């Protein structure tokens, strides 16, 4: 009987330790990334197929801050605030103008409306020239968005 109590106590303690570790990672990792990448939103989930094949729906991407238009180049994948519907959009830069830039999703046929430089939140972190992403890590966000928009 005493042995069984010890096993139960050990199980409960291990459970709480794991919860604390997972909670620390869940809360701490985004804060650490926000600080190190100089951006309030260091991660984003791809919620549509507009950036296929570079980014797939459900991918989690890492975003780094930009200081201004001098940090942006044609071909960069950026995150910008879409003021029409108060959402964020992740598309590739196709033109750089004096006061605004133009983007387009890789899978889209037409360009987006011009984006003011002050609406650019950041650009995707790249590794060996490719966007840093975790495939399917954002599937919960995609699922929740689809359920909310039904």
Question: What is the predicted role of each segment?
Answer:
Residues 3, 36, 40-47, 81-150:
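Acidic/glycine-rich C-terminal interaction modules and beta/coil loop segments
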Residues 66-71, 84-87:
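Short, charged beta-turn/beta-strand-edge "cap" motif at the junction between a beta-strand
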Residues 62, 79-80:
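Short catalytic-loop micro-motif centered on adjacent basic/acidic residues
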Residues 58-60, 73-76:
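Structural motif
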Residues 32-33, 74, 80:
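Short, positively charged
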Residues 1-68, 131-150:
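Protein maturation boundaries and topogenic segments
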Residues 72-73, 119:
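Short amphipathic alpha-helical leader/targeting segments
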